[in-house]
Every structure is written in C-alpha cells, then in structure tokens.
Amino acid sequence: IPVAVLRYVIINKTGRPLRASVCGTLPNFIGADGSKLGQDWKSDPLTSGPKKNKNEFRATAGLRGLFMSSDGVDPKDEAFGTIALAVAAGTRGTSRTAWLAAGWGTPLLDFWDDFSADGMLDPRPEMGEDMPFGSLTVELDVPANGSAETTFLLAWHFPNRRTWSPKGTPDDLIGNYYTTKWSDAWAAAEDFAGRSAGLEARTVEFIRAFATSTLPAEVKEAALFNLSTLRTQTCFRTPDGRFFGFEGSSNQAGCCFGSCTHVWNYDQATAFLFGQLSRSMRETEFLEATDAQGLMSFRVRLPIDRAREYGKAAADGQMGCIMKAYRDWKLSGDDAWLGRLWPAVKRALAFAWIKGGWDADRDGVMEGCQHNTMDVEYYGPNPQMGAWYLGALRAVEEMARH
C-alpha cells in the first residue's frame, strides 16, 4: 500500500488543559525525482522537473487534506503521478494550498508568523508556481497532565516505472503493480484509512510474536532489522504481479539490476511471509530466464520478454534457485506449480554437466569456471560452490521422487 503513516503524540506536562496544533507541510514535487538538475543563483545543483503543479483541498467521508497533481509534467514521465497529505475527517484544522509567493526567506517567515500566532493558517493566493507548497493542520485539545495524538497519511501514486535495463524504446515503460489497485494517491489513502486499524494490529501481532519467540537475540535482531528491505525501493512489482528486486538501493536509484540470483539466494523472508511473491520469482527464473540448454540468466532484463538477454549464468545463483524452487514447493504444497517448473528445473541442473561446464565429468564436484556472488570466477573444487551444488542435487532428488 503506497501510504506512510506519521503519528504525533503531544504530551501536556502542565496542570491545565492546552490547545495544540500540528502542521504538515509538503512541496508538490511531482516531476522531480533527482534525475533532472538545474542550478540555483549560486550555481549549486537544483532539482528541476515540476511544471504547472497544483494543490487542492479535499474532504471526503473518511479524510480531509491536500491532493497534489500536475497539469504540466509529461504524463509519461517517470516522476509523473499524484500525492496526498491527509488526516481523518472530523478533525479540526485549517489548510493552505499555496504559500506566499515572494523572494528569499519571506514565504517561510510568512508561514511561521501565521501559524505560530494561533495555530491556524490563513489562505494565500495561488500564483502559478511550478512547485507550490501545501500545508495542513490538526487542532488538538490536550488534557492536563495528559496526551493527545494525531495521524497524518502521506500517499503516492506514480505509475510510470521504467525498466532497469532501458533501450530508449517505448517498452522501457513497464509500470507499477500498485498503481493498478488504486486510481490515484487519494484513493490509496482512503482505502488505507478504512483498514488501518486491522493492518496495524496484524503487524504488531507479528512483531510481538517474533520478538517474544525463543530464538537467540542475534537471530531476531538480524531478521527483523532486514525485513524493512521488502518495503523499500529495492523491491517492486510490475503490473502483471511479478516481484523483482535490485541488490540494494543507492541514493537516487536501485543498485545492481536483475533480481540477481546469487544475491537473492540469501533472502528467506519473502518465501516465509509472502509465498506468492517468492513463487513469482521462481517462475521468472525458470520459465522466463532459463533457455533451452538450461542456462539461467542471473540478471533478468525487463520487460519480461527480454528476460534472457543478459545471457550469463552464475553457479551459486543457479543452484540456489533450484533449492529455492524446492523450498517454495514444500511451503506451498502446490504440485501443479512444481509441475510447471519441473522441465526447466531439470534443464537448469543438467546445465552443470555440459561439455566444459561446471561439472562436466558429473562426479558431483564442480571443477569448471564458476562465476559467483564474489563477482569473480572460481576454478576447481571449492566448498562455497560445492555446497550450493550438493544442495541442488539433493533438492532435485526429492522433487524427482515425488
């Protein structure tokens, strides 16, 4: 769900009730993703891209807040979309769809003078700025020696994901799965608001159960700290529902494309928490990225009909995918799913036995040139590749017996 929850708790340490106001402010940055840069008056880098962006106040059955869109950004631009900043309907507060249009720090000073005076905002005229600021307040009554809380929802809807392996052609635009579920950011925020209590309760239940388990503290820390990766820009789904991932995230873009097989070998969370997503990765690896000879491209190009273009296999990655196919089958119990993958699984294992291959003499030990997760080629027997290979052999044996 493309929504961030920002919850603020105001604590009153005095013996008398207080009225407080919390303000959320956001620039309408549609069109700006950091890839397009200009210069400010000091010749320092300045993000550019917004054009004829506009803010409007909305009030619906469940929410009130600001809806941000653009009339000038190219609808096919990767940074084109909508944003919403909202709070629960029925809360007291004011808003601005624009700040004062003036030079230097005057807009900020005007905002602060207005807000700090009484906790409310007076409107300012819209001056046609390309990246207008919007502000939204919530007024709270805080009891003596008590507390009060308010929640802001920040939602987004950006449909134009581009492939991680562009060719400069129209099919570089591959889209985002989540934007097929909601029409815009406001719709996503409304849907979330109606289900937020249940979603939060389930999340807390999972975390509490895991945190209070008898697993060693080091295991719990490592597992929980890394779960957040699934909710970052490292991972995404295309409109057909397939799940993909970079190796990680850099400051402005994903790092190392392709759902790299030998990197994603170390992911266990997806399979145990979101089995359908994990199985979609196996489907991509075996049904799309594996050729007739059994070579599995260890990086997948997109769109999906280009899945085999990379054309290079990784010994640990390929053997690991075989083991993961076994794991995902055991977790799901879906024999029909395994049946679809089985011919490609067999080819992927047999690829190790081709002439000049990883284990050309079929003695159960890899001796050939073995590209691997260390980004080098191993030659000759070694325990690192050997473990993956023996695991794949054993997994295939179990699947074959079934």
Predicted regions located by residue number:
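Acidic carboxylate motifs that coordinate Ca2+ or other divalent cations, activating on Asp/Glu
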Residues: 363
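Surface-exposed coil/turn segments at beta-strand junctions on protein surfaces, enriched
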Residues: 13-15, 131, 143
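Residue-level detector of short, conserved catalytic/binding motifs and their immediate flanks
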Residues: 4-6, 20, 267, 319, ...
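Active-site neighborhood of glycoside hydrolase catalytic domains
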Residues: 382-402
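Polysaccharide-binding surfaces and accessory modules of carbohydrate-active proteins
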Residues: 1-114, 136, 161-163, 167-213
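Substrate-binding groove/exosite segments of carbohydrate-active enzymes
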Residues: 116-139, 146-151, 157-158, 172-356, ...
